[in-house]
A protein has these predicted regions:
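Accessory beta->alpha helical hairpin/"wing" motif in late/C-terminal subdomains of nucleic-acid enzymes
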Residues: 71-97
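Short helix-capping/hinge SLiMs at alpha-helix to coil transitions
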Residues: 34-38
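Short amphipathic alpha-helical interaction segments
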Residues: 50-65
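Short acidic, hydrophobic short linear motifs in intrinsically disordered regions
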Residues: 39-49
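Short alpha-helical segments that sit at the start of domains
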Residues: 4-30, 110-121
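Exposed, interaction-prone assembly regions rather than primary DNA-binding/catalytic cores
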Residues: 107-205
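C-terminal regulatory/effector modules of DNA-binding transcriptional regulators
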Residues: 188-232
Length: 232
């Protein structure tokens, strides 16, 4: 991963109240984007956004003041969630990026309050931030729609690529048997296909047979169906 940068970070360039807009290259937009695809973010993502302590405090104060985020605290766990206003802003700026996460009853759009689910969302937010920091695409419009049902030519795009569990579930009924997998997603690299898990400081309740079914599912759809010859 790139080394963390030190020093002050330039202030975010946006004014939601006056313009209903935001600079999509700003730290504010990057933070809101991660919250959107995660459902609830951990404060542990801040270093991966190169946020200094002083800048982070100002940014959080501004986003809360503008009504774009809220702090959810329960069971001694603090997390950052989007407000309705924050979701509407992101959908207006980039519907192709956020519509899949912010327009239905998914866990990212309507995160629950029980501790195990919140921990999973926060662990996912850290993993996404790490991948993004390493230059690996995590947002839908940045990568091919592998699970849309249309054949893909692996020679036309660059690896590595990351796909969340939510994205592979676009295949529909075929994924029902792996819905309980604890995987956060898959990482496609030049030499191998990796299934990613993030346990953090808490143990995961494994569904052994589900993970075996996931392995078989990926072997069929990615190794044989989508990318024959790429992975042996």
């Amino acid at each position: 991963l790139p080394e963390f940068q030190s020093g002050m970070v330039k202030s975010a360039h946006y004014n939601y109240k006056k313009e209903n807009s935001m600079d999509t290259s700003s730290k504010a937009y990057k933070l809101l984007s991660l919250i959107a695809i995660s459902g609830e973010c951990s404060k542990e993502i801040y270093p991966f956004l190169y946020l200094t302590d002083s800048y982070n405090e100002k940014l959080m104060t501004r986003l809360k003041s503008d009504g774009l985020i809220k702090i959810h605290y329960k069971d001694k766990l603090r997390g950052i969630r989007l407000t309705r206003r924050g979701k509407d802003l992101l959908l207006s700026l980039s519907p192709e990026r956020f519509s899949n996460n912010l327009t239905d009853n998914s866990e990212t759009n309507r995160p629950r309050s029980d501790l195990p689910r919140r921990l999973r969302l926060q662990q996912a937010s850290i993993a996404y931030a790490m991948l993004q920091c390493a230059g690996i695409p995590v947002y839908p419009e940045e990568k091919p729609a592998l699970f849309s049902g249309n054949p893909q030519d692996s020679a036309k795009f660059a690896l590595p690529l990351f796909y969340t569990a939510r994205e592979w579930k676009e295949l529909g009924a075929e994924t029902i048997k792996i819905n309980n997998s604890r995987s956060l997603g898959i990482l496609l690299c030049e030499d191998a296909l990796y299934v990613l898990y993030f346990t953090g400081d808490h143990p995961i309740k494994w569904e052994y047979r589900t993970e075996l079914r996931l392995k078989a599912f990926l072997n069929y759809h990615l190794k044989q169906d989508m990318f024959p010859g790429l992975y042996q």
